[in-house]
Amino acid sequence: MANHKSAIKRHRQSVERAGRNRAARTRVKNAIKQVRTAITGSDKAQAGEALVAATSVLSKAASKGAMHWKKAARKISRLARAVNSIEAQ
């Protein structure tokens, strides 16, 4: 355990941040799952709504530093491409 006051504070802050980041990553995973479920159900309208929600969640996670912004952009791009491919099938 840390002995210095500043080290104790840094540890406390890192634990709080880890919890926040874990919650943000969980929200991202759940949002992506909803989009994937709508895609497998071939429901274009529901998939579109889920994509909008997932885009918001991913962008927020990236802006808060829970994930890299390029990773968020890549996931949004791939989800959008998958939703747009529903029509083509």
From Swiss-Prot:
It comes from the Bacteria. It holds the Pfam family Ribosomal_S20p. Residues 1-26 are annotated as: Disordered. One of its GO terms (molecular function) is small ribosomal subunit rRNA binding. GO terms for biological process: translation. Residues 1-12 have a biased composition (Basic residues). Keywords: Ribonucleoprotein, Ribosomal protein, RNA-binding, rRNA-binding. One of its GO terms (cellular component) is cytosol. InterPro entries: Ribosomal_bS20, Ribosomal_bS20_sf. Coiled coil: none annotated. Gene3D superfamilies: Ribosomal protein S20. Binds directly to 16S ribosomal RNA. Belongs to the bacterial ribosomal protein bS20 family. HAMAP family: Ribosomal_bS20. This is Small ribosomal subunit protein bS20. The gene is rpsT.
